[in-house]
């Protein structure tokens, strides 16, 4: 089945400032779930000017203990051995393509942990707003699918959907705070 989460936000700040804040967003005391972010690869295409980055984020396992125990019990009943939900941290991989000339950045991320049971993918874009060239539009679509755990698929997907929605809103609040701290008040219309 799977669940999707869509986010759309206009930041009243120029593209360059928004992207710089995004790249510095984590770790942040406002979101304790993101423990660290490490750049694994960064390169510039000399012909296009596009900057490619691959980053790995280490995040706390946010699956509630009751769901971890329920799933472990179900897995034991099904004669399968799985302790993957008991891990303290999960890893996310993020790839981004920043095109400074066209003032856009595309981002794709996915979960590296739990791939046997879950698929979590996000696609995001930062781009110059059509409303005002000094503003930046952010569009994100996330999708989670859980498989292999029977009736708990739906329970875990519902939890994941709620967590993703709340996480997206928290991410927007963090971005707004960082932009205001680093760049001052938002630009007027």
UniProtKB/Swiss-Prot annotation:
Recorded superkingdom:
Eukaryota
Q: Which Pfam families does the entry link to?
A: PRELI (PF04707)
Tell me a GO cellular component.
Answer: mitochondrial intermembrane space
GO MF: phosphatidic acid transfer activity
Gene Ontology biological process terms, A to Z: phospholipid transport
Which PROSITE patterns does the UniProt record give? PRELI_MSF1
PRELI/MSF1 domain location: 1-187
Q: What is this protein called?
A: PRELI domain-containing protein 2
Q: Which source organism?
A: Homo sapiens (Human)
Q: What is the lineage of its organism?
A: Eukaryota, Metazoa, Chordata, Craniata, Vertebrata
């Amino acid at each position: 089945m799977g669940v999707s989460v869509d986010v759309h936000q206009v930041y009243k700040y120029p593209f360059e400032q928004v992207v710089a804040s995004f790249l510095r967003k984590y770790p942040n005391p406002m979101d304790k779930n993101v423990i660290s972010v490490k750049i694994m690869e960064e390169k510039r295409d000399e012909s296009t000017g596009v900057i490619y980055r691959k980053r790995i984020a280490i995040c706390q396992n946010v699956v509630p203990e009751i769901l971890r125990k329920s799933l472990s019990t179900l897995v034991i009943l099904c004669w399968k051995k799985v302790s993957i939900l008991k891990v303290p941290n999960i890893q996310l991989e993020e790839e981004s393509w920043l095109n400074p000339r066209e003032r856009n950045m595309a981002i794709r991320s996915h979960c590296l942990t739990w791939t046997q049971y879950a698929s979590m993918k996000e696609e995001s874009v930062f781009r110059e707003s059509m409303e005002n060239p000094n503003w930046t539009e952010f569009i994100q679509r996330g999708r989670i699918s859980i498989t292999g755990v029977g009736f708990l698929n739906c329970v875990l997907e519902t939890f994941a959907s709620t967590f993703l929605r709340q996480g997206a809103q928290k991410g927007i609040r963090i971005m707004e705070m960082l932009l205001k701290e680093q760049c001052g008040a938002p630009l007027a219309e």
